[in-house]
Amino acid sequence: MNIMITKQFDRHLKYYTTIVKVFANGIILITAYYLVFELPVGYLIGLYIIMFVVWLLVSMFFLGRLLDFMAKMDLKK
């Protein structure tokens, strides 16, 4: 039983860290794109704000699932 809980917890944590990595790489790629093509900085700031809001929503969803799973784990003990 404990091994199964640990595997599920690791899977949830892996999803969350993958999302963080994807958004970090997205910010790097967007910055590189704007530097290469010399586009206006206003667009870049707007994209950063949009990416930050999307990242917050997605990470809150997965962090909420992770915390919910941890709470269920404590109730089983």
Curated annotation (Swiss-Prot):
Its main location: membrane. It comes from the Archaea. It is found in: Cell membrane. The keyword Transmembrane applies. Keywords: Cell membrane, Membrane, Transmembrane, Transmembrane helix. The chain crosses the membrane at residues 22-42, 44-64. One of its GO terms (cellular component) is plasma membrane. It is a multi-pass membrane protein. This is Uncharacterized protein MJ0184. It comes from Methanocaldococcus jannaschii (strain ATCC 43067 / DSM 2661 / JAL-1 / JCM 10045 / NBRC 100440). The lineage of its organism: Archaea, Methanobacteriati, Methanobacteriota, Methanomada group, Methanococci.
